């Protein structure tokens, strides 16, 4: 089988999963974890925050991210499921 260059989750999903596992990760660490630039992580964090999937709490000079488990998934195919259900399946 040829090596695939795609994944089942988007970079948004990867960042969300990383923050669910470690809510105090720094942007640099998230970029390394996901394999994208820090700038891309910043855009994703803004998308997730603006979309209501993530909130940010300042703790001194650091950010603490809170994933909104009750938020519905965006695509019509999965809209009856929540972020928490997706993360729960991936943690299992």
Language-model-derived ranges and their functions:
Residues 22-26:
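Short capping segments at the starts of secondary-structure elements
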Residues 39:
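Key DNA-contact positions within bacterial/archaeal DNA-binding proteins
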Residues 72-92:
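Amphipathic alpha-helical dimerization/coiled-coil segments
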Residues 1-14:
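Short alpha-helical segments that sit at the start of domains
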Residues 58-64:
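Short, Lys/Arg-rich nucleic-acid/phosphate-binding segment
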Residues 29-32, 49-50:
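Alpha-helical residues within the helix-turn-helix
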Residues 45-46:
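Short, hydrophobic-biased segments on the C-terminal half of alpha helices
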Residues 17-21:
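Short, locally clustered residues in the helix-turn-helix/winged-helix DNA-binding domain
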């Amino acid at each position: 089988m040829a090596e695939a260059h795609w994944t089942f989750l988007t970079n948004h999903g990867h960042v969300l999963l990383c923050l669910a596992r470690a809510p105090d990760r720094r942007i640099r660490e998230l970029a390394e974890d996901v394999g994208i630039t820090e700038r891309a992580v910043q855009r994703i964090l803004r998308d997730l925050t603006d979309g209501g999937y993530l909130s940010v709490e300042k703790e001194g000079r650091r950010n603490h991210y809170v994933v909104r488990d009750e938020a519905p998934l965006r695509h019509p195919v999965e809209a009856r499921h929540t972020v928490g259900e997706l993360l729960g399946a991936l943690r299992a």
